[in-house]
C-alpha cells in the first residue's frame, strides 16, 4: 500500500472589507470538495486560508466607521468564518494576514530578497493629499477628463469616453478622500526585480503547474518583458512596515500570499505532527496547491513563485484556476437581485443545494460557471431528492416493517453491484482531476440504474404477495447498500447529507475504501427524511432580499439618463462626418500589467490591425470573453502614447461606469473595416 500523500491546499484570501457572496463561494466550495476527497482517501491533506487584512481601503473604511482597522478586520473575519462554516467549508485553519506569523515571514522573505540583490529603490512622483497627509492611488483621485470634459472621473481613465491618461493630465484634480486639491510630491519606492526570474518563470509556467490556457496567457506577458514590481506604500497605511525603512509599508499584494505560509505556521504550532519546513522547504516532497480565480493569475503565477524562489522556498505544485460566476447568464447584479451574499442565501436555502449544483457544473478548466436558477431548482430536486434520497426512502420502510430494521446480506443483482464497484476508480479519477461535473454525471448514472432496478423489482407489489417477503428484504437490502455506495461517492460534496445517512445506516464515518464492502445482517436506525425539495418561492424570496437600488431604477423618465448626462451642444453634419467610425473585430483582449482599469484590445479593421487601450476592465473581468466580438471603433483618432504603449484609437461603449459599461456591437452581418454611416 502506498504512503499517504502530504498535501497543503489553499484558497485565495478574501479581502477583509466586505461580505462573502456566491461568486466567492464557488472557489471555497470547489477547494473544500477536493480536500474532503483527499481526506476520505486517507491522504494527509491540510486546508488553510486567512482574511486578507491590509491596505488603504481597510484603513479608510475603519476611519469612516469610527473604529480601528484592527476592530474592523476582526469583525469581518468573524462574519467570514461564520459564512464559511455554515456552507460546510472545513478549513484546518483560518487565520489573518495581520498576524505575527505573517509579519515575521514577510520581513524575513523581504530581507532574503534584498540581501540577494532582488530589491531596487527609486523615486516616484505621485499626487499627495495635503489634508489627509497621504499619497493617493489613481482610484483616490477624481477630476475632469482631459479628452471629453466629463467631470468626476478617476485618475487613470474616463468612464464616459473610455480615454486613458496619467493622473497628472486630469483637469481640476481632487482627492476622492478629502476633496482637497492634491499636490505632486516625490517619494522613494521599493521594487521587486521580477525580471531577475524571467528564465525560471518561463520554465515553471510550462512545467505542468498550470492549465494550458493559463500558461498560454502568461507566455504573452513573459514574451512582452517583465517589469519591476512596486512593493511599497507610504504612511499612513494599514500593513507591515518594511524593515529598515521607516514610514514605508509592504504593498498588500506582497504580504497577502505569504499569508498562506503564515496560516500554516500558525496551525503547526497547534498540531505537532505538522512540520513547516516539510511543506515549504526548498526540497519539500509535499504537494502544494493554490485554488484561485483567473483575475489574480499574474500575482500567483509570476510574482509569488519568483518571491519563493528568491527567498529559498519551494514553488507551488500547481495552481488550480477557475472562472467567474454568472447568474442566469449575466454578471451578478444588485438591481436584479442576483448579487447574492452568502448569508442571504443561507437565510433561505440549504447550503448543500448550492454545493451540489456547483459540483455538477465545475470542470477542470477556467470557463465561467453560470448559476441558472431554474436549472438549479430542477437539478437539485431531480438528482438529489428524486434519485439519491429516493432510493433510501423507497426501501427503508420495508426493512423496518418486515425485518425489524435488520438489513439482510443478499445480493439479488450481482451485475448491478459490480457496476457500482467498477465505477469507483473513474469517479475517484474525476475528483482528483477536479472534473467534478464528470464525477456527478457518473454518480447520477448509477443512481438512475439503481432506481430503475428497484422499480423493476417493485418491492411494494411483492410485499402484497404471499411468500415473497424474503425477496422484498433482498431487494430493499441491496437498495440500501447501493444508496450507501452513492453516499460514499457524494460525501466530498454533501457532508451534511452523508452524516445524516451514516446515522440512519448506523455506521462510522464512511471512507472511500468503504465502497468495496457491503452491509449484511446489520441493524439500521429509523429512517428520517434526508433532504427536502427546493421550493421555487424560497429562491424568489432570496432574490427579492438581494435586490438593491430598485427605487432609483423605478423613477419616472424625468430622472432618467438625459437628466444625468444632458445631450451635448449641436454640431453640423460635417463635424460628425469627420469622425471615421469603423467595425472592428476584437482578435485578442488581455489585462494590462500594472493598470487597474485598462484592457488591451488587438483589433482587426479589415486590411489593418490596431492596438487600443480601453478603461472597461471593471465591466469585463474576463478579457477573453470579448475575443471574437465585433465592436465600433473610432479609426481616425490621433494615436496616444501612454506608459503601457500607444493607443491607436478608441472603442465605443455606453453606461455610467463601473460594472455598468456596455461595449457597443453592430447588428449581425457587419464586417471588419466597414464604415459606420
Curated annotation (Swiss-Prot):
A Pfam match: tRNA-synt_1g
Gene Ontology CC terms: cytosol
Domain tRNA-binding residues, every copy: 575-677
Residues the entry annotates as binding ATP: 334
Family under the similarity heading: Belongs to the class-I aminoacyl-tRNA synthetase family. MetG type 1 subfamily.
NCBIfam families registered for this protein in UniProt: metG, metG_C_term, PRK00133.1
The protein, known as: Methionine--tRNA ligase
Amino acid at each position: 500500500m502506498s504512503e499517504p500523500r502530504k498535501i497543503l491546499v489553499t484558497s485565495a484570501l478574501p479581502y477583509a472589507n466586505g461580505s462573502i457572496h456566491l461568486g466567492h463561494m464557488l472557489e471555497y466550495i470547489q477547494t473544500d470538495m477536493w480536500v474532503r476527497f483527499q481526506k476520505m482517501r486517507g491522504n494527509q491533506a491540510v486546508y488553510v486560508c486567512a482574511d486578507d487584512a491590509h491596505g488603504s481601503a481597510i484603513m479608510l473604511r475603519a476611519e469612516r466607521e469610527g473604529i480601528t482597522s484592527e476592530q474592523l478586520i476582526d469583525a469581518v473575519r468573524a462574519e467570514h468564518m461564520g459564512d464559511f462554516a455554515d456552507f460546510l467549508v472545513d478549513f484546518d485553519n483560518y487565520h489573518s494576514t495581520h498576524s505575527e506569523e505573517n509579519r515575521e515571514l514577510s520581513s524575513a522573505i523581504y530581507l532574503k530578497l534584498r540581501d540577494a540583490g532582488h530589491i531596487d529603490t527609486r523615486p516616484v512622483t505621485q499626487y499627495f493629499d495635503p489634508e489627509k497627509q497621504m499619497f493617493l492611488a489613481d482610484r483616490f483621485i477624481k477630476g475632469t477628463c482631459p479628452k471629453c470634459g466629463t467631470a468626476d472621473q478617476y485618475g487613470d481613465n474616463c468612464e464616459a469616453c473610455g480615454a486613458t491618461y496619467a493622473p497628472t493630465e486630469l483637469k481640476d484634480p481632487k482627492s476622492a478622500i478629502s476633496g482637497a486639491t492634491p499636490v505632486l510630491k516625490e517619494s522613494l519606492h521599493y521594487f521587486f526585480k521580477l525580471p531577475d526570474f524571467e528564465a525560471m518563470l518561463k520554465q515553471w509556467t510550462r512545467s505542468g503547474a498550470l492549465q494550458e490556457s493559463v500558461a498560454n496567457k502568461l507566455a504573452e506577458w513573459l514574451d512582452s518583458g517583465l517589469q519591476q514590481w512596486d512593493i511599497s506604500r507610504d504612511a499612513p497605511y494599514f500593513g507591515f512596515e518594511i524593515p529598515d525603512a521607516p514610514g514605508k509599508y509592504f504593498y498588500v499584494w506582497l504580504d497577502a500570499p505569504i499569508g498562506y505560509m503564515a496560516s500554516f505556521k500558525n496551525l503547526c504550532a497547534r498540531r505537532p505532527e505538522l512540520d513547516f519546513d516539510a511543506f515549504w522547504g526548498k526540497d519539500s516532497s509535499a504537494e502544494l496547491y493554490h485554488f484561485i480565480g483567473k483575475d489574480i493569475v499574474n500575482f500567483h503565477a509570476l510574482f509569488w513563485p519568483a518571491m519563493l524562489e528568491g527567498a529559498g522556498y519551494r514553488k507551488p505544485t500547481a495552481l488550480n484556476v477557475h472562472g467567474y460566476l454568472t447568474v442566469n447568464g449575466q454578471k451578478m447584479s444588485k438591481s436584479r437581485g442576483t448579487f447574492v451574499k452568502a448569508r442571504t442565501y443561507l437565510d433561505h436555502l440549504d447550503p448543500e443545494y448550492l454545493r451540489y449544483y456547483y459540483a455538477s457544473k465545475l470542470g477542470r478548466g477556467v470557463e465561467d460557471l453560470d448559476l441558472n436558477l431554474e436549472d438549479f431548482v430542477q437539478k437539485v430536486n431531480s438528482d438529489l431528492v428524486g434519485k439519491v434520497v429516493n432510493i433510501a426512502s423507497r426501501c427503508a420502510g420495508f426493512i423496518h416493517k418486515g425485518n425489524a430494521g435488520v438489513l439482510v446480506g443478499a445480493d439479488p443483482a450481482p451485475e448491478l453491484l459490480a457496476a457500482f464497484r467498477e465505477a469507483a476508480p473513474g469517479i475517484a479519477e474525476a475528483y482528483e482531476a477536479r472534473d467534478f461535473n464528470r464525477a456527478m454525471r457518473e454518480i447520477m448514472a448509477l443512481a438512475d440504474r439503481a432506481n430503475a432496478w428497484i422499480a423493476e423489482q417493485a418491492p411494494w407489489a411483492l410485499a402484497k404477495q404471499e411468500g415473497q417477503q424474503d425477496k422484498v428484504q433482498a431487494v430493499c437490502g441491496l437498495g440500501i447498500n447501493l444508496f450507501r455506495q452513492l453516499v460514499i461517492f457524494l460525501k466530498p460534496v454533501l457532508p451534511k447529507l452523508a452524516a445524516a445517512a451514516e446515522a440512519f445506516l448506523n455506521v462510522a464515518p464512511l471512507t472511500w475504501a468503504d465502497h468495496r464492502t457491503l452491509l449484511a445482517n446489520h441493524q439500521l436506525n429509523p429512517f428520517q427524511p434526508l433532504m427536502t425539495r427546493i421550493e421555487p418561492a424560497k429562491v424568489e424570496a432570496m432574490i427579492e432580499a438581494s435586490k438593491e437600488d430598485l427605487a432609483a431604477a423605478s423613477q419616472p423618465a424625468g430622472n432618467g439618463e438625459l437628466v444625468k448626462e444632458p445631450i451635448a451642444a449641436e454640431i453640423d453634419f460635417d463635424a460628425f462626418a469627420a469622425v471615421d467610425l469603423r467595425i472592428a473585430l476584437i482578435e485578442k483582449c488581455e489585462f494590462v500589467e500594472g493598470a487597474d482599469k485598462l484592457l488591451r484590445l488587438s483589433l482587426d479593421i479589415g486590411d489593418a490591425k490596431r492596438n487600443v487601450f480601453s478603461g472597461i476592465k471593471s465591466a469585463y473581468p474576463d478579457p477573453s470573453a470579448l475575443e471574437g466580438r465585433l465592436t465600433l471603433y473610432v479609426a481616425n483618432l490621433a494615436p496616444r502614447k501612454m506608459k503601457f504603449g500607444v493607443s491607436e484609437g478608441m472603442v465605443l461603449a455606453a453606461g455610467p461606469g463601473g460594472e455598468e459599461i456596455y461595449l457597443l456591437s453592430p447588428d449581425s452581418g457587419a464586417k471588419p473595416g466597414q464604415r459606420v454611416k
